[in-house]
Amino acid sequence: MTNIRKTHPLLKIINSSFVDLPAPSSLSSWWNFGSLLGVCLGVQILTGLFLAMHYTSDTATAFNSVTHICRDVNYGWLLRYLHANGASMFFICLYLHVGRGLYYGSYTYSETWNIGILLLFAVMATAFMGYVLPWGQMSFWGATVITNLLSAIPYIGTDLVQWIWGGFSVDKATLTRFFAFHFLLPFIVTALVMVHLLFLHETGSNNPTGIPSDSDMIPFHPYYTIKDILGFLIMLTALSSLVLFSPDLLGDPDNYIPANPLNTPPHIKPEWYFLFAYAILRSIPNKLGGVLALVMSILILAIVPILHVSKQRSMMFRPLSQCLFWLLVAVLFTLTWIGGQPVEHPYIIIGQTASVLYFLIILILMPAISLTENYLLKW
């Protein structure tokens, strides 16, 4: 008799995705982040659902409802901090996942890669709208500054901003719609994740060598299920430690001050995971130019497959490209640091230099070094 997991209409989908899936035998821990992102998404949806039961999306009561959750709801403080720091873990895993894709040439699976970019944008939009909901000072001013960037779009900009705001400033209508979209988007993200996996399973996984591994495959279960569970334990330990020992480490103290449209905070900045893009935005002294650079800093990922000119897929055997990759990582850390600093000397020039380097490495230096390595292969 055939096993039910191979015949049942629903179980056979799960079976072919997580049990009998042929996987390359050489996958390293860098391949753990996909499953970790799945866990993060699950944690965020669950904690978010319970938070939404007690939250009120009204400017008069939003801040107090969050305080009420932390003080009066059973384990409300735990839910709130799991959700806030869960977002940080989500982005750590997300950036490591994208970095893995860049390093090992996974972007040559163009459908999977493009859905991934779409997912990145969707998660960033969700996180931005979620940050507005507690209605603290940084929530209000962050929403005002970032939505106002759309006014840089010629002709329709101002109308577009007022349409998003639902009025002439960030107010009750804005908060209500942001809550609605913040609730809706994670489910759209979940659907996109399924499409992401669908396209991935069409081609099979890449591996660290970048060499086709069709002749050396192992079943996903038990080998990679056990490996993934170890990843879950490490990540959940890190998240628990952050939540239970220093829950406000990654937050902004200004967000404990209720939103006040008459009082601007000295330094308006987004959460840490957007600081690199914020630094690129600020480094250009023109509004429209800054907005374009901001969008391009993420959208540039879409042209990475076109810029791949190397004869080898992975960077595993390309030491020169490896040096450039780690320089890019250093530039991103620098941008993240600069994004949190005030706009004054010497931070301005450091930010501008790092922004130029960021685009220079991806657009010019990486392809140039790849061509050099191709030439060296002939020796």
Curated annotation (Swiss-Prot):
<dbReference type="GO" id="GO:0006122">
    <property type="term" value="P:mitochondrial electron transport, ubiquinol to cytochrome c"/>
</dbReference>
<keyword id="KW-0249">Electron transport</keyword>
<keyword id="KW-0479">Metal-binding</keyword>
<keyword id="KW-0813">Transport</keyword>
<keyword id="KW-0812">Transmembrane</keyword>
<dbReference type="GO" id="GO:0045275">
    <property type="term" value="C:respiratory chain complex III"/>
</dbReference>
<dbReference type="GO" id="GO:0008121">
    <property type="term" value="F:ubiquinol-cytochrome-c reductase activity"/>
</dbReference>
<keyword id="KW-0408">Iron</keyword>
<dbReference type="InterPro" id="IPR048259">
    <property type="entry name" value="Cytochrome_b_N_euk/bac"/>
</dbReference>
<dbReference type="Pfam" id="PF00033">
    <property type="entry name" value="Cytochrome_B"/>
</dbReference>
<feature type="transmembrane region" description="Helical">
    <location>
        <begin position="77"/>
        <end position="98"/>
    </location>
</feature>
<dbReference type="InterPro" id="IPR016174">
    <property type="entry name" value="Di-haem_cyt_TM"/>
</dbReference>
<comment type="function">
    <text>Component of the ubiquinol-cytochrome c reductase complex (complex III or cytochrome b-c1 complex) that is part of the mitochondrial respiratory chain. The b-c1 complex mediates electron transfer from ubiquinol to cytochrome c. Contributes to the generation of a proton gradient across the mitochondrial membrane that is then used for ATP synthesis.</text>
</comment>
<feature type="transmembrane region" description="Helical">
    <location>
        <begin position="178"/>
        <end position="198"/>
    </location>
</feature>
<feature type="transmembrane region" description="Helical">
    <location>
        <begin position="113"/>
        <end position="133"/>
    </location>
</feature>
<dbReference type="Pfam" id="PF00032">
    <property type="entry name" value="Cytochrom_B_C"/>
</dbReference>
<dbReference type="InterPro" id="IPR030689">
    <property type="entry name" value="Cytochrome_b"/>
</dbReference>
<dbReference type="GO" id="GO:0005743">
    <property type="term" value="C:mitochondrial inner membrane"/>
</dbReference>
<keyword id="KW-0472">Membrane</keyword>
<dbReference type="InterPro" id="IPR005798">
    <property type="entry name" value="Cyt_b/b6_C"/>
</dbReference>
<dbReference type="InterPro" id="IPR005797">
    <property type="entry name" value="Cyt_b/b6_N"/>
</dbReference>
<keyword id="KW-1133">Transmembrane helix</keyword>
<feature type="transmembrane region" description="Helical">
    <location>
        <begin position="347"/>
        <end position="367"/>
    </location>
</feature>
<dbReference type="GO" id="GO:0046872">
    <property type="term" value="F:metal ion binding"/>
</dbReference>
<feature type="transmembrane region" description="Helical">
    <location>
        <begin position="320"/>
        <end position="340"/>
    </location>
</feature>
<dbReference type="InterPro" id="IPR048260">
    <property type="entry name" value="Cytochrome_b_C_euk/bac"/>
</dbReference>
<feature type="binding site" description="axial binding residue">
    <location>
        <position position="196"/>
    </location>
    <ligand>
        <name>heme b b566</name>
    </ligand>
</feature>
<keyword id="KW-0679">Respiratory chain</keyword>
<keyword id="KW-0496">Mitochondrion</keyword>
<dbReference type="InterPro" id="IPR036150">
    <property type="entry name" value="Cyt_b/b6_C_sf"/>
</dbReference>
<feature type="binding site" description="axial binding residue">
    <location>
        <position position="182"/>
    </location>
    <ligand>
        <name>heme b b562</name>
    </ligand>
</feature>
<comment type="subunit">
    <text>The cytochrome bc1 complex contains 11 subunits: 3 respiratory subunits (MT-CYB, CYC1 and UQCRFS1), 2 core proteins (UQCRC1 and UQCRC2) and 6 low-molecular weight proteins (UQCRH/QCR6, UQCRB/QCR7, UQCRQ/QCR8, UQCR10/QCR9, UQCR11/QCR10 and a cleavage product of UQCRFS1). This cytochrome bc1 complex then forms a dimer.</text>
</comment>
<feature type="transmembrane region" description="Helical">
    <location>
        <begin position="288"/>
        <end position="308"/>
    </location>
</feature>
<keyword id="KW-0830">Ubiquinone</keyword>
<protein>
    <recommendedName>
        <fullName>Cytochrome b</fullName>
    </recommendedName>
</protein>
<feature type="binding site" description="axial binding residue">
    <location>
        <position position="83"/>
    </location>
    <ligand>
        <name>heme b b562</name>
    </ligand>
</feature>
<keyword id="KW-0349">Heme</keyword>
<comment type="similarity">
    <text>Belongs to the cytochrome b family.</text>
</comment>
<feature type="binding site" description="axial binding residue">
    <location>
        <position position="97"/>
    </location>
    <ligand>
        <name>heme b b566</name>
    </ligand>
</feature>
<dbReference type="InterPro" id="IPR027387">
    <property type="entry name" value="Cytb/b6-like_sf"/>
</dbReference>
<feature type="transmembrane region" description="Helical">
    <location>
        <begin position="226"/>
        <end position="246"/>
    </location>
</feature>
<feature type="transmembrane region" description="Helical">
    <location>
        <begin position="33"/>
        <end position="53"/>
    </location>
</feature>
